[in-house]
Amino acid sequence: MLMPKRVKYRKNHLPHIKGKETRGLKLAFGDYGIQAVGRGYVDSRMIESCRVIMAKNIGKTGKYWIRIFPDVAWTKKPLEVRMGGGKGDPEKWIFPVKPGRIMFELTGVDEDTAKHIARLIGFRLPFEVRLISRV
């Protein structure tokens, strides 16, 4: 699972996910990209399940890139603990996604396979995604 090796601060405020994305809007590596239409937080387990889908469906000739990295700590207090006593411990690592962000890129596959992969990835993310192409 993806997580940072070292962080300056263990606990941080959650970033706002209002508005549209201003970075990561264009394809940088592959011929096809999976772009977020909605907004939400993606954790490292979701990214790993998407990676497994791409690895299984691309084959030996294709290649994929993961353009997001979870570097924000998501904290949670234990169950049945009263309020107060400070912020909870980090539970998982997340990446805030705004509409327009390209999260994954693919190359070496035909358009039907890319559409199939985008559909499968859409089932595993908490917001809507779409396939974009360089052509």
From Swiss-Prot:
InterPro entries linked to this entry: Ribosomal_uL16, Ribosomal_uL16_bact-type, Ribosomal_uL16_CS, Ribosomal_uL16_dom, Ribosomal_uL16_sf
GO biological process, one term: translation
GO molecular function, one term: tRNA binding
UniProt KW keywords: Ribonucleoprotein, Ribosomal protein, RNA-binding, rRNA-binding, tRNA-binding
Superkingdom of the source species: Bacteria
Gene Ontology cellular component annotations, sorted alphabetically: cytosolic large ribosomal subunit
Chain's role: Binds 23S rRNA and is also seen to make contacts with the A and possibly P site tRNAs.
Subunit structure: Part of the 50S ribosomal subunit.
HAMAP family tied to this protein: Ribosomal_uL16 (MF_01342)
Name this polypeptide is given: Large ribosomal subunit protein uL16
Natural source organism: Coprothermobacter proteolyticus (strain ATCC 35245 / DSM 5265 / OCM 4 / BT)
Gene responsible for this protein: rplP
